């Protein structure tokens, strides 16, 4: 089993999308990259803690490669928007890859370089590629948020 952690705006739709991929064993919504221990959603929404809304993914690398997760990640959001996605703005909504190994770092950066060379997006990619920090699981009401409410999609 391996881990991947991505921030792509509001974590509700991101979590639901990754749950649908074959080889993904579990997905948890949470917060990462900030300076406050055990933050709450209310804390993170102040835009003062430095945390991003993220999903932490447990996946089987024999069934789905990290590159495939990256393809899904870049297809879920606009990685050229700095600190926002759609109507949501603030550093908590930044585009970020928290890598769990030097290999993930290399693969993620090469993936971004390839997307840039292919001119896949009309503006520069601003996605951060940074070492994984402490993942703080979000409150239970954020887990499987769309599923619990019978919603198919979020605004991402």
From Swiss-Prot:
Pfam families: PMSR. The active site is at 10. Keywords: Oxidoreductase. One of its GO terms (molecular function) is L-methionine:thioredoxin-disulfide S-oxidoreductase activity. The keyword Glycoprotein does not apply. GO terms for biological process: protein modification process. It is an enzyme of class 1 (oxidoreductase). InterPro entries: Met_Sox_Rdtase_MsrA_dom (IPR002569), Met_Sox_Rdtase_MsrA_sf (IPR036509). Has an important function as a repair enzyme for proteins that have been inactivated by oxidation. Catalyzes the reversible oxidation-reduction of methionine sulfoxide in proteins to methionine. HAMAP family: MsrA. This is Peptide methionine sulfoxide reductase MsrA. It comes from Acidobacterium capsulatum (strain ATCC 51196 / DSM 11244 / BCRC 80197 / JCM 7670 / NBRC 15755 / NCIMB 13165 / 161). The gene is msrA.
